[in-house]
From Swiss-Prot:
The name this protein goes by in its record: Chalcone synthase 1
Source organism per UniProt: Sinapis alba (White mustard)
Catalysed reactions listed for this entry: (E)-4-coumaroyl-CoA + 3 malonyl-CoA + 3 H(+) = 2',4,4',6'-tetrahydroxychalcone + 3 CO2 + 4 CoA
InterPro entries listed in its UniProt record: Chalcone/stilbene_synt_C, Chalcone/stilbene_synt_N, Chalcone/stilbene_synthase_AS, Polyketide_synthase_type-III, Thiolase-like
Function: The primary product of this enzyme is 4,2',4',6'-tetrahydroxychalcone (also termed naringenin-chalcone or chalcone) which can under specific conditions spontaneously isomerize into naringenin.
């Protein structure tokens, strides 16, 4: 076998890599048609779970819903379905088969809806898609949701797929980090990223001994978001980045073991939350910012545009207070929380879409609310934090 010379290997490696940074070239979102109004949800939830006798707990749940700052949430689960599946309405009853039967079919379908919108905005033939990254915390199956999406969209059988299951709320940052690496290390790559989340795996009735589970029932919702990611946009073909990704990092916060846990059991996906999650995140967030922005010489956090996973209003409040952020910094984040709830991994991608939409509507100079540099944060089980440095583009 003839060994390649170092220079030719270097040339091959260079030829395989993109020249410029990865950019988000298109965004699409989708939600189930069925939705609930948060102010009405406590009455509905305690009625459908046959828990109206738990009057004190219902009052606590009402306060949770009031404090959530959520106006409405989309949910695939309808009242009719829940009436036919009473085990899903209990706090702990065997129900995994019924839950799996829903999500194995519906997660790829909802993902397809978002992907079709992203591909339409991108404006290129879907045959140009080289990679698929699919992320969900809703159910597991083989072949996975990545395979089902590839079939639903009619993508090439040679498309390179990556399936991420059971990551939780930080994973909107993870998919960006992975897509960035794929796009920048494979010249001409176009990565379809899809996060699709359906709460059929986590829905359950109330328990007065597990209030952390009730927090999830007040926050979680269904949604899917899709991106096309690629480097070296083909301007002549009509490609144009919406945001560019400059760097991406992941870290496990110190002293945070067990702060957020999820366990897939016969009863579905159980959710456990420690009270001090907002404190753990706000205490450690500046270190992540320092590490991410020191190379750029940026230390004024109000000079950035902000996209933060809206785990709940307490997290956003604590981060704002700790960093001295102006109230408008979290506008896009709080808007998505209000209108959609906590859609786990899909949230930050919805916020990207909301930010670019409002930037165009307001006539500001860039896709990042008129600012040049921004940060995207994902928070979730671990506690794991994803930090993505973004560069906006002119509107």
């Amino acid at each position: 076998m003839v060994m390649g010379t170092p220079s030719s290997l270097d040339e091959i490696r260079k030829a395989q890599r993109a020249d410029g940074p990865a950019g988000i070239l298109a965004i699409g979102t989708a939600n189930p048609a069925n939705h609930v109004i948060q102010a009405e949800y406590p009455d509905y939830y305690f009625r459908i779970t046959n828990s109206e006798h738990m009057t004190d707990l219902k009052e606590k749940f009402k306060r949770m819903c009031d404090k959530s700052t959520i106006r409405k949430r989309h949910m695939h689960l309808t009242e009719e379905f829940l009436k036919d599946n009473p085990n899903m309405c209990a706090y702990m009853a065997p129900s995994l088969d019924a839950r799996q039967d829903i999500v194995v079919v519906e997660v790829p379908k909802l993902g397809k809806e978002a992907a079709v919108k992203a591909i339409k905005e991108w404006g290129q033939p879907k045959s140009k898609i080289t990679h698929v990254v699919f992320c969900t915390t809703s159910g597991v199956d083989m072949p996975g949701a990545d395979y089902q999406l590839t079939k639903l969209l009619g993508l090439r059988p040679s498309v390179k797929r990556l399936m991420m299951y059971q990551q939780g709320c930080f994973a909107g940052g993870t998919v960006l980090r992975l897509a960035k690496d794929l796009a920048e290390n494979n010249r001409g790559a176009r990565v379809l990223v899809v996060c699709s989340e359906i709460t059929a795996v986590t829905f359950r009735g109330p328990s007065d001994t597990h209030l952390d589970s009730l927090v999830g029932q007040a926050l979680f919702s269904d949604g899917a978001a899709a991106l096309i990611v690629g480097s070296d946009a083909d301007i002549s073909a009509g490609e144009k980045p919406i945001f560019e990704m400059v760097s991406a990092a992941q870290t496990i916060l110190p002293d945070s073991d067990g702060a957020i846990d999820g366990h897939l059991r016969e009863v579905g996906l159980t959710f456990h939350l420690l009270k001090d999650v907002p404190g753990l995140i706000s205490k450690n967030i500046e270190k992540s910012l320092d590490e991410a922005f020191k190379p750029l010489g940026i230390s004024d956090w109000n000079s950035l545009f902000w996209i933060a996973h809206p785990g709940g209003p307490a997290i956003l409040d604590d981060v704002e207070k700790k960093l001295g952020l102006k109230a408008e910094k979290m506008r896009a984040t709080r808007h998505v929380l209000s209108e959609y709830g906590n859609m786990s991994s899909a949230c930050v991608l919805f916020i990207l879409d909301e930010m670019r939409r409002k930037s165009v509507e307001d006539g500001v100079a860039t896709t990042g609310e008129g600012l040049e540099w921004g940060v995207l944060f994902g928070f979730g089980p671990g506690l794991t934090v994803e930090t993505v440095v973004l560069h906006s583009v002119p509107v």
